[in-house]
Amino acid sequence: NDWTTATGKQVHLSLCFNPSHLEFVNPVATGRVRARQDLMGDTKRTRSMAVLIHGDAAFIGEGVVQETLNLSRVPGYTVGGTLHIIVNNQIGFTTRPNEGRSSMYATSVAKMLPAPIFHVNGEDPEAVAQCVLLALEFRARYQLDVVIDMYGYRRLGHNESDEPTFTQPVLYRRIAERKSVREGYLEHLLKLGEVTRAEADQIATHRQTLLEQNLAEARSEPGTQLKFERSKKWKNYFGGPEPTEETATGVDKQKLAALLEAQTRLPDDFHPHPKIVRWLAARKKMAREEHALDWAAAESLAFATLALEGVRIRLSGEDSGRGTFSHRHAVLHDYENGQLYT
């Protein structure tokens, strides 16, 4: 969805599909942001960012949160900082905080990073807004994750069929007696003289009328099949029930030999490991058909031919540079000074 700001700037908002598996969407969302940054050449990480919304019990309880935080400053994964917003209901379904974690705060896991953590009262909309602005300024300046822990409460049950007073009767009696956030904020504005109750009621009535009109229109219109058009980045991706035609993927032998030979050349000032010297010599023999290709050489040629056609090649994870079985050596380390050569 594209949104025009008050200053006339366009902002594209993309919402990821969030599965019922809590927090699984985190690496998906940050991965999409990183892919977008790479495609745009946004090496400064200023043109797009990730906003992740969490629950308090899930943020401290799900391991994928820690894994995502751990990768936030790793060069191959960083997105220049993510804004984490925890909607802290102080309960996880029926589980109280002291039953679901050993730390005082749900945000304790974020202390593994040099990231600020803002605890803010969710019943104070202006304080929440100030926190968000401060968090965005920090992220823009320091390119680090920021966490906002917004304290609130769940007025109703976990879902439509949940009866919260079965397990938290005292808490939910107090919640039932408490004014809504809107009423509490309205009283604050009335004391400041910023608005009259009649004006506030008029705003609320107007918004409610608009919502009811939109709902009525949605219910009255016949169901239609939405037409989905892929953006230009996805135009060449297609699928369907029918098998695709067989595509010729072969490459000329001379071109393969030249690519394999090119992979054995190193800068004049690079000092390879003694065993790498022998490994490179074996590759040269393969290029000259003096030695049979092995699986690792075939893999490197597959990558090389794709790269030659302008296809981006990205390998990530432990040992992806050298290869788990010392077979790939896509990234070499200078034996004397440790400098990298890809």
Q: Which residues fall in each region the model found?
A:
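Generic beta-strand/beta-sheet core signal
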Residues: V51-H54, I60-E62, I85-N88, F118-N121, ...
